[in-house]
Structure formats: C-alpha cells, structure tokens
C-alpha cells in the first residue's frame, strides 16, 4: 500500500539540527517516573493482531476499570507491518490487518485516554520475519513520530556482528544509536530494550551482565530474560512465571527511578494458571515495581481477574516513586520472603509460597530489617485488614499463593537496616556464616544466611550480630566487629562486593580474589537499600 499519513520532516521530528546533549534516561526520570502499565497483544495473540482487536481492547479497558486503575498504554507487537518497505524506505502497516491505518488507530486510542506504542527490531528482520530497523533508524523514528507513537519496544532478533565488533558490542552499537536518535526528538519515545534477553540463557553470563550494565543508560525499561509462555505455548505457565521471577531477583541493583527491570507480560487469562498463581504474578511484579503490561483477551477477563488487576493498594506499591525493587530477605525450598522500602517510610514484605503444599508459619521482623523491640501496624494489601504485630507476622498460604503486607513505622521505630540474602547470581548459592567460618551453601532460610549491611559497608549476619564479615588476605571469616577496613565492603553496579582493605572481591565458594570483569563467580545480589556505586 502507499503510505497515507502526514509526514513530519526529520528536522522537525528531531529536536533540531543544533547539537543536543544525549542524557541517560536514569538522569532524566521524568520521562517515565514510574513503570508503565497497559496492554500488549503478543503473549495472548502473537501475530494474530488487527485493528478490531485493538479497538475492542481499548473500549474494554476504558469501561472495565483498567484505564481508571492506571493501565493507560496500548502497545502493538510484531507482525503489524508489510513484508517490504515502501520505495522511500519507510515502514508500511498491513492494510488488511489495519484498514484505517495506524495513525487512525493511534488517534482512536488517544481519544479514549490511552498512549500508543509500537514494536520494531534492532536487526535486519523482526522475529516474525518483517523488516527490521537496522540501517533505517532515523526514518523509522520519523515515521513513528508522524503516527503519534510514544512508546517503542525494540526487539533483538537477527542481529549479526559487523566491523570487528563482538555480538554484545553490536547490540550496544544498535541500541545506543536508537537512544541517540530518540533523545533528539521533540517528544522522546519511551524506549523498551530487549537486548539483555538474547544473552540470558548462556552458562557464562559475562555478556548478559555487561548488557545489563548499559541498558539503563539508553532506555526506560529492559526485557532481561526469556519470553513468558504464550497462550498457545507448550509447558507450564507457572514454571514460566517462576523463571522470569527468578531472573528479576538477579538484577535488582540496576533499577532506579527512570529505569525498570521488565520480567515480561502479565498473562492474566492463561488457562494453565490457577487464580492464586495469577494473583501471585501480579503481586510479585508489583513488589518489584515492574512494568504491568497485560497480554490477555481483555473483553473476556473475568470479574476475579479484574479484581486483582485493579487492586489499588498493590498498584500503589508498583507505582511508588522510590521504584525500589523488592529483594530476597530469605529463601528456602518453599518460601521466598522479599522486602523493600516505600516512599512514605513504610516497609513492604512479600511472601511467596513456591512449594507444592500449603504453609502456615511466622515471618520474623528482624529478617525484614525491623526491630523486634517495636510494635508495628501491618496492612494486608489483598484484603485491606490491619493488625498489630511484634516480633513476627503469622501467615498462611496456599501453594503458589503470595501474601503482601505494608508495615507502618513510627518515629521511634523508623530505622530500617538493609537486610537479606547475599547470593551469587550464577549459582544461586547463599553466603553463609557459622561460628567463624563463611562459605556458600544452598539457601535454606536460616539466619546464618541473612545479612545486615550498614551505611559504612559493615556486614554482619543475623545469627551472630556481634561478628562481621572480614577479609584477611584472600580468606574471609566472621570476626568480632572492630570497624577496621577488612570489615568494610562496597557494592558496585557490576555486582561486585569489594573489600576496602584487600581490594579483592567476594568470590563464590568462599574467599576473595582479584576482581574480574562481570565473572560468574563474583556477581552477587544484595538487599534493597544498600548503596550501589555506579
């Protein structure tokens, strides 16, 4: 088809021909101060998309409470375009699928109160075999601006190294180029990057870590790992959710206002999920302050699905201006306990039963970084009820269910010390301190694996709080706290935990060694609230 649209000259679509300072999104979080919420067709419909689907989805979201709850983005995924570009090099929509065109659809979506997003690929072809953006980045940016697009998901299929670059360097070049182009636009697009996902399933995670290092500099969110299971896919939908959940726990250090880790879509109508499992995905994503992008047949969502998807207390957690990602306070074979701070000074605790049996147990407040000498008010964010707690929270959970509590603190008990697991992200093993010895073991939920890190970088285990993690040469141990440099540690965006005295980095299996570059054995996850050196 011929392109029927109002063209905006590139000089107008971009800010100007004058030099423009390109700033990282994390330096200008006002572009996306909280994670995006909305709809994308891919996990539910894949390439079976058309104008009718998006009109009906828009109408349903405007009337069923989703728009009012904050889901204000309508995003197209792959397969919306023709297999060939126009003679002038521009992309064209498939006129059979979108007879009135994407500019018309964008206007319709916006007339209902939504923003409009689109999909492209950084390589020479999209994952579905349609034209990629490589070599056409500026004309595609111009096209999207003309169509009223304000959100771009840029995939990473069909990328091949050129000019002596490694594959990781090629991705950085392509996504960096898009970042420059988008940053110069009068109205910069929200930029969703899929680059990390293409490095997430290798045994050596150095390239994955490296890509994760640079994506916050270029965009507002990044798909860090494998796709969530699609509606027609084979396998367990719950296992797929758990895979993406676990990947998200590995990258908390990167998240901050203006940049969000993306564990992929909410698959709210997947037939393989129980209601508890659907609610768990939503609660975990909200606790992460992750994007809440629903991929489902919106007009047919049940009242039960709409009820949890519009839970205002959990949406408020997701949209909290701190954007702090919940991290692991404790983990064993059945329970994960996650914590984070909220902007109003309260503490969030999220408890996931990933085991196969129902569980009833107490969650001690000290593993959440709170004092056991204080009394707190804890609000159940599912039901809204409030209870007074001291020492612990009593919870009862069905298999694959998740509880979420907001714990209010008063002035006398407002201090929160970052507390939780220190774990190697490649092996999943937890740093464990017993008596004077320190090593790496399977996570078992014991207090010998739960650490507190104070503002000076001193680290102590909850099981023996008078003893601190100490480096001496290449050995580590628990020694009486004395505030010497061998007991002071710094945490970097690369995941390295570096000792101030030796200059060595914590290494999986026990001990410290010369700091490597993004090596599997030296990348660790730490509790939310620990200072991260950029």
Curated annotation (Swiss-Prot):
Positions of the catalytic residues: 155 (nucleophile), 213 (proton donor)
One Pfam family, short name: Melibiase_C
Cellular compartment(s): Secreted
EC number of this enzyme: 3.2.1.22
UniProt KW Lyase keyword: no
Xref: Gene3D superfamilies: 2.80.10.50, Aldolase class I, Golgi alpha-mannosidase II
Sequence ranges assigned to domain Ricin B-type lectin in this UniProt record: 413-534
N-terminal signal peptide: 1-25
One Gene Ontology molecular-function label: alpha-galactosidase activity
Keywords, alphabetical: Disulfide bond, Glycoprotein, Glycosidase, Hydrolase, Lectin, Secreted, Signal
List of glycosylated residues: 50, 88, 94, 124, 204, 444
Function: Hydrolyzes a variety of simple alpha-D-galactoside as well as more complex molecules such as oligosaccharides and polysaccharides.
PANTHER family: ALPHA-GALACTOSIDASE A-RELATED, ALPHA-GALACTOSIDASE/ALPHA-N-ACETYLGALACTOSAMINIDASE
Family to which this protein belongs: Belongs to the glycosyl hydrolase 27 family.
Protein name in the entry: Probable alpha-galactosidase A
Organism expressing this protein natively: Aspergillus flavus (strain ATCC 200026 / FGSC A1120 / IAM 13836 / NRRL 3357 / JCM 12722 / SRRC 167)
């Amino acid at each position: 088809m011929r392109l029927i649209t109002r063209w905006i000259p590139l000089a107008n679509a971009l800010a100007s021909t004058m030099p423009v300072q390109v700033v990282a999104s994390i330096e200008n979080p006002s572009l996306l101060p909280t994670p995006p919420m909305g709809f994308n067709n891919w996990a539910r419909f894949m390439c079976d998309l058309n104008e009718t689907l998006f009109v009906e989805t828009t109408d349903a979201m405007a009337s069923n409470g989703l728009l009012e709850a904050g889901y204000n983005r309508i995003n197209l995924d792959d397969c919306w375009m023709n297999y060939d570009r126009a003679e002038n090099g521009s992309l064209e929509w498939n006129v059979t699928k979108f007879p009135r065109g994407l500019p018309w659809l964008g206007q319709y979506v916006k007339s209902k109160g939504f923003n409009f997003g689109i999909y492209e690929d950084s390589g020479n072809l999209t994952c579905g075999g349609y034209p990629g953006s490589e070599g056409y980045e500026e004309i595609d940016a111009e096209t999207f601006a003309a169509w009223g697009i304000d959100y771009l998901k840029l995939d990473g299929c069909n990328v091949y190294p050129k000019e002596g670059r490694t594959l990781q360097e090629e991705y950085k070049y392509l996504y960096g180029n898009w970042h420059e182009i988008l940053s110069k636009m009068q109205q910069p697009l929200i930029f969703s990057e899929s680059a990390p996902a293409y490095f997430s399933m290798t045994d050596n995670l150095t390239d994955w870590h490296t890509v994760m290092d640079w994506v916050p500099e270029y965009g507002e969110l990044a798909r860090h790992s494998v796709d969530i299971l699609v509606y027609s896919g084979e396998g367990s939908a719950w296992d797929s959710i758990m895979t993406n959940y676990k990947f998200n726990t590995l990258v908390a250090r990167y998240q901050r206002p203006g940049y969000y880790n993306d564990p992929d879509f909410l698959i709210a109508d997947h037939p393989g999920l129980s209601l508890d499992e659907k609610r768990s995905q939503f609660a975990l994503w909200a606790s992460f302050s992750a994007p809440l992008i629903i991929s489902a047949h919106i007009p047919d969502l049940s009242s039960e699905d709409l009820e949890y998807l519009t839970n205002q207390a959990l949406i408020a957690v997701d949209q909290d201006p701190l954007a702090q990602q919940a991290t692991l306070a404790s983990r064993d074979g059945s329970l994960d306990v996650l914590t984070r701070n909220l902007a109003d000074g309260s503490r969030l605790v999220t408890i996931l039963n990933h085991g196969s049996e129902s569980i009833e147990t107490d969650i001690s407040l000290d593993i959440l970084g709170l004092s056991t000498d204080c009394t707190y008010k804890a609000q159940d964010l599912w039901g809204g009820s409030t209870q007074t707690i001291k020492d612990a929270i009593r919870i009862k959970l069905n298999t694959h269910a998740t509880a979420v509590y907001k714990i209010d603190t008063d002035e006398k008990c407002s201090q929160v010390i970052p507390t939780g697991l220190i774990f190697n992200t490649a092996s999943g093993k937890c740093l464990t301190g017993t008596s004077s010895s320190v090593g790496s073991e399977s996570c078992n939920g014991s207090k010998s694996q739960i650490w507190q890190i104070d503002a000076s970088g001193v680290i102590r285990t909850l099981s023996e709080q008078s003893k601190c993690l100490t480096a001496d040469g290449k050995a580590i141990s628990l020694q009486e706290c004395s505030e010497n440099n061998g007991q002071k540690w710094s945490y970097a965006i690369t995941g390295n935990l570096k000792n101030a005295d030796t200059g060595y980095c914590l290494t999986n299996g026990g001990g410290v060694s010369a700091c490597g570059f993004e090596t599997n054995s030296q990348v660790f996850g730490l509790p939310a609230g620990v200072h991260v050196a950029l």
